[in-house]
């Protein structure tokens, strides 16, 4: 009889949750297990979920300080817990998933689900172990700690201490790392480790709401000898804005749309530029690729930037002039700054975290 699948719960409110869920699911499959990834919010009320997802993106991109007020309010007051009743369809979908798949292990990458799980009948709750995968770094939102779990997985030791300060016993916290895509751990060629000389490869990942993004892209494209790739994501309007801003420089850059090949793409780069989202921050650390941060969403992303500070590689470059200057400084003296940057990232990198987490989940599932 095949063991039951590991049920992984995620939500589309930030790339970090989905990236962690996909990374763990792929690693479980590589280790011979099975996993089911589900988003009860999206599956139970897709239209309403898409509305709130778009509202979330609008707030973090255009009104980040308003988002921060909501984020902090949910940290200090039980607003989410007191409004769970409004999400009953998601709770019922979650219960249906558990009753259908009968998992022995549930791993969640979005904290609200642990509060739903606490509402399950005890005889159903006792049939599985709950593993909470914290996608925050350094500063941890209270929601990760305000409902029980059997284990908490965190990206690093400083985050473990922050979670412990919220009341979780240290023996229940495992700093395994952030479960990025297992392809980051493959022993394949890593062209981005080769010194760039004066001709670096630079990837700029544009946020749809980032003011000044196309202008930053034009600043990069104007640098002679640089191989520049501009990632515009799913929104074709972003690509059009970039092309208009580039004008005659358009032929000097590669435009990259939505892709699932980030491990191999990051492996080729000498520098990556983008906002301090949870997924991108962790992926650049895993790939040991120097990361220039254009934007830090207050509250939600401050911990990611704090993590880069902890490693000693934080660089805030909100415009083209700053980004070009930081890259040129790193390239000076035969790439001295770039080499130091890479060495610090290599010390912090845990590209196999998803595989070690998969092994833990499968051991609990046996």
What role is predicted for each listed range?
Residues 23-100:
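Conserved N-terminal ligand/cofactor-binding loop architecture of enzyme catalytic domains
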Residues 179-194:
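Acidic anion/phosphate-binding donor-loop and adjacent secondary structure
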Residues 190, 196-269:
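Donor-nucleotide binding loops and adjacent catalytic segments primarily
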Residues 315, 320-321, 327-346:
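Conserved donor-nucleotide binding/catalytic region of nucleotide-linked donor-dependent transferases
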Residues 281, 285-326:
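Catalytic binding pocket for nucleotide-activated donors in carbohydrate/polymer assembly enzymes
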Residues 350-366:
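C-terminal alpha-helical cap of glycosyltransferases
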Residues 267-277:
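Acidic donor-binding loop of glycosyltransferase active sites
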Residues 123-183:
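Active-site-proximal region of nucleotide-activated glycan assembly enzymes
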């Amino acid at each position: 009889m095949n063991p039951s699948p590991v049920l992984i719960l995620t939500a589309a409110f930030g790339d970090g949750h989905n990236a962690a869920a996909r990374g763990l699911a792929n690693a479980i499959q590589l280790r011979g297990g099975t996993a089911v990834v589900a988003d009860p919010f999206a599956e139970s009320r897709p239209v309403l979920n898409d509305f709130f997802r778009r509202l979330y993106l609008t707030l973090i991109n255009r009104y980040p300080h308003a988002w921060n007020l909501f984020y902090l309010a949910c940290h200090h007051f039980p607003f989410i817990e007191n409004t769970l009743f409004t999400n009953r369809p998601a709770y019922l979908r979650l219960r249906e998933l558990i009753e259908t798949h009968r998992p022995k292990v549930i791993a969640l990458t979005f904290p609200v689900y642990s509060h739903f799980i606490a509402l399950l009948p005890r005889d159903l709750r006792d049939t599985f172990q709950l593993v909470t995968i914290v996608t925050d770094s350094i500063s941890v939102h209270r929601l990760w700690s305000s409902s029980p779990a059997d284990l908490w997985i965190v990206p690093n030791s400083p985050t473990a201490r922050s979670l412990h300060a919220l009341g979780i016993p240290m023996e229940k916290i495992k700093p395994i790392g952030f479960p990025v895509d297992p392809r980051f751990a493959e022993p394949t060629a890593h062209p981005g480790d080769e010194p760039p000389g004066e001709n670096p490869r630079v990837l700029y990942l544009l946020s749809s709401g980032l003011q000044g993004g196309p202008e930053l892209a034009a600043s990069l494209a104007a640098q002679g000898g640089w191989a520049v790739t501009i990632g515009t994501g799913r929104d074709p309007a972003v690509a059009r804005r970039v092309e208009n801003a580039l004008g005659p420089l358009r032929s000097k850059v590669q435009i990259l749309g939505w892709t699932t090949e980030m491990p191999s793409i990051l492996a080729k780069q000498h520098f990556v530029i983008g906002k301090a989202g949870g997924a991108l921050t962790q992926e650049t650390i895993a790939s040991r690729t120097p990361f220039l941060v254009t934007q830090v969403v207050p509250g939600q992303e401050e911990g990611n930037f704090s993590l880069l500070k902890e490693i000693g590689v934080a660089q805030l470059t909100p415009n083209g002039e700053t980004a070009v200057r930081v890259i040129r400084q790193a390239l000076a003296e035969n790439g001295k700054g770039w080499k130091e940057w890479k060495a610090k990232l290599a010390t912090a990198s845990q590209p196999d975290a998803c595989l070690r987490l998969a092994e833990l989940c499968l051991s609990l599932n046996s």
